[in-house]
Amino acid sequence: MSERVILAYSGGLDTSVAISWIGKETGREVVAVAIDLGQGGEDMEVVRQRALDCGAVEAVVVDARDEFAEGYCLPTILNNALYMDRYPLVSAISRPLIVKHLVEAAREHGGGIVAHGCTGKGNDQVRFEVGFASLAPDLEVLAPVRDYAWTREKAIAFAEENAIPINVTKRSPFSIDQNVWGRAVETGFLEHLWNAPTKDVYSYTEDPTVNWNTPDEVIVGFERGMPVSIDGNAVTMLQAIEELNRRAGAQGVGRLDVVEDRLVGIKSREIYEAPGAMVLITAHAELEHVTLERELARFKRHTDQRWAELVYDGLWYSPLKTALESFVAKTQEHVSGEIRLVLHGGHIAVNGRRSAESLYDFNLATYDEGDTFDQSAAKGFVYVHGLSSKLSARRDLQ
């Protein structure tokens, strides 16, 4: 028997075509592996059956929802990770988990080749292949969409010619990737930067004006940086994301229209929906404002940005990322408490904070009676703090 190919299967156009194409062009058997990351939509059994209908000799579905939430979404929260200060890494954090399960499937099903359906213009090819190189450098990688220059038109034509069951047309050519952390939409008319997104682009969020008269106030509780409660009710990491997806999505929260710098050197336009992610990152960052010491908070802003860049760039398994996470774990020792937020009209507004670990001292901060701040010490502090600037200015005026 020829060596099997283990394919990362999404159920979409490119990977459905890839099953049939790999079988016809290489003569190898294909094992399709679909990972349930809480993407919703089609039943995963339907996806599994489609893989078999497309020619896979085996089709495996892995329920990785809790693993994804706890091992991949949670670190994104702890690092307040927003690539280019906007994108909460919806697709980027899912790829290393998919890689992990593909490697496991390759060992279990006798596969020496792993395959993905990424193009040569995107970031995901890097995320997959750097991940494979990190976890299983002995595996060969096959990338038919990239290496054989498939276009969407060619893929659609191949699907039609070979009766591949996939719901995509030239009239509706969106490329969509989604999981419980969010949803990404690209291509089609969105490639023209002046074109506004139409209603059919969105799925996770309502129009921000729909529930204009009914804002939603929510309290998110944290322990050592991890979300543990919603409105006082204990939740798992997955439950926290799912509930906030529903509630924030109903308020139109989490819609992002982004032109981002891809790893491959081009700019691309993406429409993201990440209601739960944006609420959790906002709440966590606010709690850090209350509980982290000033110099630590300042430095962590730099590491947060670097962590997001590493993950976006496909370096999930890099030594630097591992080292940064050890640092971040230390920073979270006192990040416990509750943040109250109002979700309304597409916006998130923090309006309350409480924590037993708070560094906010009311008696030092108040301007009313009971003020314990020794203002007499301020004059000397100001003199010393500004001395270098004073000396520099005096020199420059000479």
Curated annotation (Swiss-Prot):
Chief subcellular location: cytoplasm
Positions bound to L-aspartate: 119, 123-124
Compartments reported by the entry: Cytoplasm
Keywords of this entry: Amino-acid biosynthesis, Arginine biosynthesis, ATP-binding, Cytoplasm, Ligase, Nucleotide-binding
Pathway annotation: Amino-acid biosynthesis; L-arginine biosynthesis; L-arginine from L-ornithine and carbamoyl phosphate: step 2/3
Biological-process GO terms, alphabetical: argininosuccinate metabolic process; L-arginine biosynthetic process; urea cycle
Keyword Nucleotide-binding: yes
One Pfam family of this chain: Arginosuc_syn_C
Reactions accelerated catalytically: L-citrulline + L-aspartate + ATP = 2-(N(omega)-L-arginino)succinate + AMP + diphosphate + H(+)
Disulfide bonds: none
Binding of L-citrulline, residues: 87, 123, 127, 175, 260, 272
Residues the record lists as binding ATP: 8-16, 117
InterPro entries noted in UniProt: Arginosuc_syn_C, Arginosuc_syn_N, Arginosuc_synth, Arginosuc_synth_CS, Arginosuc_synth_type_1_subfam, AS_cat/multimer_dom_body, Rossmann-like_a/b/a_fold
Single GO molecular function: argininosuccinate synthase activity
Enzyme Commission number, as recorded: 6.3.4.5
GO cellular component, one term: cytoplasm
Family membership noted in the UniProt record: Belongs to the argininosuccinate synthase family. Type 1 subfamily.
Subunit details: Homotetramer.
The protein, known as: Argininosuccinate synthase
Native organism: Mycobacterium marinum (strain ATCC BAA-535 / M)
